[in-house]
A protein has these predicted regions:
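Conserved phosphate-donor/acceptor-positioning beta-strand/loop module used by diverse small-molecule
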Residues: 133-135, 148-170
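Long, charge-dense
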Residues: 175-199
Length: 357
């Protein structure tokens, strides 16, 4: 009987990788725009391949050695092609479009520069920081850390659950029911005759008997719990490569976090970074004072009501859950998540606790 070989990729082109990770509606779009504008950071990319490898490993469908080798190959391939603009997105309206990048001309020049054999040496000289936005990845990211070691930094963006609830409810309606599932390039699992997002492994029956807003609440809870467990378990191993940033604190006073991002990535802010921050309205007077991007509107964003304070904005979002038919049990879960988040991240921020409820 043949013994299965160990799968490896010993050589690696990748110098540094930054993953901006978080749940739907947490504010990744804002963060990726700002991080991209820092020195040496590459144009924003998305990697369902990376997310799916980690998901399959979590589900026991891919062995550790295979997952780690695939991650090293995939990251090297993306970097290699990015350095020749083979992966550059020229669709003007896309968030990952080169037209939204502060170094637009860099990617145009790469189209006409020498590639292939000269790319590895250019990577060594320029030390580019590969940059991805990822979704709900931190809890399942052990294969990434094992594959890439200190080359990877993961920025976890967290946000008040009530500010993420509308988008995640819309996702349950638009993405996880036919025909929306055809545009979702992530792993699903089979339960009875239904397919479910793999994030609901272990709570399949709860998912199936819940309505969209309840599914959003229970999924949010599970991801949050798994993520906190991962951080606790691997604090000693990977803690220096994980930077958790509360959205609310960042948009009100970003400077400490910007310095920490620079330290984690061994890079720095530039005048272009400050220009992008101003465009994103950071810092801002109120948390809800976002900018009216089309992507935000499609995800349920509405401009804040001027007469409402921060606490009243939270009350309005909680009412959304009730109006969408959330059960008492689901509301209890939501309220507990909100309380825990407020105590952990917002206890010293004036006006951001729902004490009036």
């Amino acid at each position: 009987m043949n013994i299965a070989p160990l799968v490896v990729r010993d050589e690696i082109l990748l110098e540094n990788l930054v993953l901006v990770d978080g749940q739907g509606g947490c504010g990744k779009t804002l963060f990726t725009a700002i991080v991209t504008a820092m020195d040496r950071v590459e144009l924003l990319n998305y990697s369902p391949e990376l997310e799916n490898i980690c998901a399959l490993n979590y589900l026991g469908k891919i062995e550790d050695d295979a997952a780690q080798a695939m991650i090293r190959i995939q990251m090297d391939l993306v970097l290699y092609e990015t350095m020749m603009s083979r992966r550059t997105n020229f669709r003007p309206a896309d968030l990952s479009s080169v037209f939204r990048d502060v170094d637009f001309l860099t990617y145009v020049k790469r189209l006409f520069s020498k590639g292939d054999e000269v790319v590895p040496e250019r990577i060594k000289e320029e030390k580019p920081i590969l940059h991805f936005a990822t979704h709900n990845l931190l809890a399942y990211s052990e294969p990434i850390h094992k594959a890439l070691g200190k080359k990877v930094v993961l920025i976890e963006v967290v946000r008040h659950p009530l500010y993420m609830l509308i988008q995640q409810t819309l996702n349950q309606i638009n993405h996880f029911e036919s025909p929306g599932t055809a545009r979702q390039f992530n792993i699903f699992i089979k339960h009875k005759d239904k397919q479910l997002p793999y994030l609901n492994f272990g709570q399949e029956e709860l998912y199936l008997r819940s309505n969209p807003v309840e599914r959003a609440i229970y999924e949010m809870q599970k991801i949050s719990d798994l993520t906190e467990s991962f951080k606790d378990k691997f604090k000693g191993s990977y803690g220096r490569q994980i930077l958790t940033i509360p959205f609310e604190r960042f948009v009100l006073d970003p400077w400490l976090y910007m310095r920490r991002i620079g330290d984690f990535l061994a890079t720095k802010m530039t005048s272009k970074t400050r220009k992008v921050m101003k465009k994103q309205n950071v810092p801002r007077g109120r948390i809800s004072d976002g900018i009216p991007l089309d992507i935000y509107k499609r995800c349920g964003w509405e401009p804040p009501e001027k007469e409402l304070n921060e606490q009243q904005e939270l009350v309005k979002r909680r009412q959304f859950a009730i109006e969408q038919g959330a059960s008492k049990k689901a509301m209890s879960v939501l309220d507990r998540m909100c309380h825990d988040y407020e105590e952990k991240y917002l206890s010293t921020v004036s006006g951001l606790k729902r004490s009036a409820m």
